[in-house]
Every structure is written in structure tokens, then in C-alpha cells.
Amino acid sequence: MKLAFMGTPDFSVPVLAEILAAGHEVVAVYSQPPRKAGRGMAEQPSPVHRFAEEHGIPVFTPVSLKGEAEQQAFASLDLDVAVVVAYGLILPKPVLEAPRLGCLNLHASLLPRWRGAAPIQRAIMAGDAETGVMVMQMEEGLDTGPVLLAERVAIAPDETAGGLHDRLSHIGASLMVRALAALSRGGLAAAPQPEEGVTYARKIEKAEARIDWRRPANELDCHIRGLTPFPGAFFEIARGGETIRVKILRAKPVAKSGEPGKVLDAGESIIIACGEGALEISGLQRAGKAAVTARDFLRGFALKPGESVA
């Protein structure tokens, strides 16, 4: 089929790759404009933008699709369908209706649970046992369209947002190719989303990254995994008038107790008491430093039982 692909981050790239491998005619790629990044703060194209250029596909990076000129340019592509995967811009009604078969969106949750910007992180942070990917027919509401295909995925007890992100990206790529094949044959039925069970996966805020040791250890375990690798859950240690920020990369709940935020053990691992239970930390990273094991961290940083962290 003749289509446009609309996406921006790493999550979207495997989907575009699978669509190309399946032999579809991708006549245009839409991605968010280049952003300043890196030490030199030079403008960097998005991962989807780079992939498309490497494969000789025309790339468009409008700051908005609300203008009539952009909408007419999109309509002039004369598409069978548009595929949207983590694009990041709102698609107005004229854009949604321009392709002959509309716009398909790949969403990384079991809708209507976790509509919105951060479904992968929120599913782990909430302690969900499973999530999934869904292909839906887009409409003007936020992730409200009818579902065309879905695949459920179990969340492993030690899975991080980064690991789940990569798994769902590849599962979703295969699902989207299946959806396009069925759509081209006219054999894809749409099922409306249930009205009950709606939750919203709001964007991750910086303030959420600080660990609140008053919470139960099992909740903090989910919280940390949901924020790994980005932005990373952290705590702070006061040292001689200096505040040192430390990210937790790997931890697990253990059956120990103490005053929340107090170090219970600092040997092969670091154990810190929580509101209920404790966290045994095995991987950490100081700001601006490399990731290390707890043992290596303690070689360069004295942290003693009885000390409190914030």
C-alpha cells in the first residue's frame, strides 16, 4: 500500500523498518523537527528522521499540522493509509481523513488503560502484571479510537521500562505489518474500546524521579524500574555541605525493616529501609559518573549502616 509514516523516537524505528521489509510503498516520513542535543547543543534529527534519510525516503518536519498549507501538502500525497507511532504532534481532522483508509496508530498499552504519553513507564510503576500493544484507527480523541489488532504481553518481575520499551517496539512492528496486510484485503474489523477501565499515562515529571523512602519497598521497586533508564530514580546523600545525587539502576525488595531512608547494610549491596520492608540496591550511578555495582560504589564512597539518605 501507498503510505506515510509518522513517528519520532527510537520506539518507532523498528515499525518503519518492518513496513519497508514487507514491501509497502512509503512515500513520506513525518517526524518532529531536529532538536538541540549533545555537548555542542547542535541540532540533531530524530531517530526516525535519520533512518528515513538512510533509506532515501523524503522527510517532512513541520512544527504543526494545524495550518491549511501543511494539511493540503499531506492530502496531496494521495495515500492509502498513514501509520502513526509516537509522532508527538496532534493530527487535526483534515489530516486524519486525508488517507483513503485513514490513520492507524500503534499504542503501547492495553487500551483503554494507559492512554497518553507514557504508557510503558506507567504500567511498570503501577505494578501491572501485563501490558501490550494495540493498533487502532485514529480519531480526534486522545487514544480513543477503535482497536483493530492487539497483543498482550506479560511484564517480568524485574523488567525495566527500557527493556519493555524494546520488546514492545518489535512486537508492535510485527503487529502493524499484520494490520496493514489485513487492511489491504479488507478483512480488518474494528472493536470500540470499553467505556470502563480508562486510565491516563501522564508524562513523567522530574519531581517523580526522587525516591520517597516512606513508601513500601515493593512500590519503590516498581517505581524505580518504571523510571529506568530515563529519567532514573534517585536519592541524595549529604557530605560536608555537598549534596550528592545517586541513581538506582538495580534493586529488589527484601524483608528487613528500619526507619525510612536509613542505611541498614553497606557491603556487597546497599540495603535501605523503606516505609514497609527495605530495598537491596546492587547497581547505582552518581551524577556525571559511570554506572557501577554497589560494591564498587562503596569502594569510592563511604556509606555506613545507620546513615540516612534523602
UniProtKB/Swiss-Prot annotation:
<dbReference type="InterPro" id="IPR036477">
    <property type="entry name" value="Formyl_transf_N_sf"/>
</dbReference>
<comment type="function">
    <text>Attaches a formyl group to the free amino group of methionyl-tRNA(fMet). The formyl group appears to play a dual role in the initiator identity of N-formylmethionyl-tRNA by promoting its recognition by IF2 and preventing the misappropriation of this tRNA by the elongation apparatus.</text>
</comment>
<comment type="similarity">
    <text>Belongs to the Fmt family.</text>
</comment>
<dbReference type="InterPro" id="IPR001555">
    <property type="entry name" value="GART_AS"/>
</dbReference>
<dbReference type="InterPro" id="IPR005793">
    <property type="entry name" value="Formyl_trans_C"/>
</dbReference>
<keyword id="KW-0808">Transferase</keyword>
<dbReference type="Pfam" id="PF02911">
    <property type="entry name" value="Formyl_trans_C"/>
</dbReference>
<keyword id="KW-0648">Protein biosynthesis</keyword>
<dbReference type="InterPro" id="IPR005794">
    <property type="entry name" value="Fmt"/>
</dbReference>
<dbReference type="GO" id="GO:0004479">
    <property type="term" value="F:methionyl-tRNA formyltransferase activity"/>
</dbReference>
<dbReference type="InterPro" id="IPR002376">
    <property type="entry name" value="Formyl_transf_N"/>
</dbReference>
<feature type="binding site">
    <location>
        <begin position="109"/>
        <end position="112"/>
    </location>
    <ligand>
        <name>(6S)-5,6,7,8-tetrahydrofolate</name>
    </ligand>
</feature>
<protein>
    <recommendedName>
        <fullName>Methionyl-tRNA formyltransferase</fullName>
        <ecNumber>2.1.2.9</ecNumber>
    </recommendedName>
</protein>
<dbReference type="InterPro" id="IPR041711">
    <property type="entry name" value="Met-tRNA-FMT_N"/>
</dbReference>
<dbReference type="Pfam" id="PF00551">
    <property type="entry name" value="Formyl_trans_N"/>
</dbReference>
<dbReference type="InterPro" id="IPR044135">
    <property type="entry name" value="Met-tRNA-FMT_C"/>
</dbReference>
<dbReference type="GO" id="GO:0005829">
    <property type="term" value="C:cytosol"/>
</dbReference>
<dbReference type="InterPro" id="IPR011034">
    <property type="entry name" value="Formyl_transferase-like_C_sf"/>
</dbReference>
